[in-house]
Amino acid sequence: GGSIPCIETCVWTGCFLVPGCSCKSDKKCYLN
């Protein structure tokens, strides 16, 4: 759903620390 925040933040590289997280427009990673 993209509403659960992950610890990781992102700029260009995407999200890698937590599987299933994706980069959103606020430069933070959220669980899909």
Swiss-Prot record:
Post-translational modification: This is a cyclic peptide.
Job of this protein: Probably participates in a plant defense mechanism.
Species for this entry: Gloeospermum pauciflorum
Disulfide bonds: 6-21, 10-23, 15-29
InterPro entries: Cyclotide
Keywords: Disulfide bond, Knottin, Plant defense
Metal-binding among keywords: no
Protein name, UniProt field: Cyclotide glopa A
Cross-link (Cyclopeptide (Gly-Asn)): 1-32
Pfam families tied to this protein: Cyclotide
A single BP term in Gene Ontology: defense response
Family: Belongs to the cyclotide family. Bracelet subfamily.
Domain statement: The presence of a 'disulfide through disulfide knot' structurally defines this protein as a knottin.
Keyword Zinc-finger part of the UniProt annotation: no
